[in-house]
């Protein structure tokens, strides 16, 4: 029993040894007289056909400012080496072996548009060689490729970047580089949070140079990337729209509140801050202005214009008759036509189309005419009493003497007196008229001051109403402009949601 156990144990231990010997013998036979500088073709006039496939793993980052794309990918090379063919039955049914990179011939295919400091950023893995002579090599790598970033529609932009692979020293007659079937493999692709990948394409090109008649083939693997807009819409666009809409609140704020200018300047500074963020994201190029930058610039123009109009509104609101006269054109436009168009109602004024004055009329309005007519009527009615002024002035001396002599009552005044035209006049009547004249004179002064005060107050109210009209007009105009410009700018984008 012990002898049988010993024989079985020896057989088990000897099996892997024989297998290892077969593999060693295979390596020795394959490497005998093998030169890794020799192209693996039986006829030197034939090209080595190399098939290349890219297995995309992840888009790590897109640096718009430096126009560099960071990608994690595996390169899949296959070609046939006629020097590495064996009969697997002679070598213990070994179907494949591994060789380190550099041990056997490999194509000098490089990434032309690499911006890595080492240029070739692949990890040199082992090559798998099959008994049929097929060589399979899959070097992974983190690639940094240059890509021209088109920021015209940022953040609703689509970028088309590519890998350009080609032989560095072999022309097309010595190395024929071809894209493999299913040239761009995205079965293991990890989705990126910022970029969607709706399409990948492969294209083979042949380029001829003036120095050489041979073609130089290359293979382009294109990445059609579309930016996801949720982040920018939620963190930049919506806050900017809401901030811009706050400028409309400035036109509804009363001028006496004293915060109209403060609000507009605060909004302007906020828009400038958002614009600085966009400028930091965008590459320093003058070829195009990003769509988001156009939107922010438009918002900044709106806020700047609203600040200017706010200053103008405050200037109108605090004008007085001592400093400014309202011209007829300004009066007709701001007090009648625009309020009628905007359906603004002023207490005590009923505006209809029939009552509107001509826009360029220089005649005073009806309210001014009635006010002037009332003043003239009052002066005319009071001037009738002035007919007695001459007689009163003729007899003023007598009245003064009578008062100085102690004649304190009308009964002590002479009953008759000769007037300037030689007629006899009742002295008591003259004294009464004199007192009434003095009362009239004082009332005239008071009335004049009241009328002047009313006119000044009316003029100030006109300026304040004109400021209110400009405020309301700006509210409507800026609201329409903000809505139309926002829709127009974003409607021109190739897409809104990725």
From Swiss-Prot:
Pfam families: Neur_chan_LBD, Neur_chan_memb. GO terms for cellular component: acetylcholine-gated channel complex; cell projection; neuron projection; plasma membrane; postsynaptic membrane; synapse. One of its GO terms (biological process) is monoatomic ion transmembrane transport. It is a multi-pass membrane protein. GO terms for molecular function: acetylcholine-gated monoatomic cation-selective channel activity; excitatory extracellular ligand-gated monoatomic ion channel activity; transmembrane signaling receptor activity; transmitter-gated monoatomic ion channel activity involved in regulation of postsynaptic membrane potential. Keywords: Cell membrane, Disulfide bond, Glycoprotein, Ion channel, Ion transport, Ligand-gated ion channel, Membrane, Postsynaptic cell membrane, Receptor, Signal, Synapse, Transmembrane, Transmembrane helix, Transport. Residues 20-230 are extracellular. InterPro entries: Neur_chan_lig-bd, Neur_chan_lig-bd_sf, Neur_channel, Neuro-gated_channel_TM_sf, Neuro_actylchol_rec, Neurotrans-gated_channel_TM, Neurotransmitter_ion_chnl_CS, Nicotinic_acetylcholine_rcpt. The chain crosses the membrane at residues 231-252, 261-279, 295-314, 473-493. Disulfide bonds join 147-161, 211-212. Disruption phenotype: Uncoordinated movement and reduced body wall muscle currents. These phenotypes are probably related. It is found in: Postsynaptic cell membrane; Cell membrane. The keyword ATP-binding does not apply. PROSITE patterns: NEUROTR_ION_CHANNEL. Glycans are attached at residues 43, 93. Residues 315-472 are cytoplasmic. Residues 1-19 form the signal peptide. After binding acetylcholine, the AChR responds by an extensive change in conformation that affects all subunits and leads to opening of an ion-conducting channel across the plasma membrane. A subunit of the levamisole-insensitive nicotinic receptor. NCBIfam families: LIC (TIGR00860). PANTHER family: NEUROTRANSMITTER GATED ION CHANNEL. Belongs to the ligand-gated ion channel (TC 1.A.9) family. Acetylcholine receptor (TC 1.A.9.1) subfamily. This is Acetylcholine receptor subunit alpha-type acr-16. It comes from Caenorhabditis elegans.
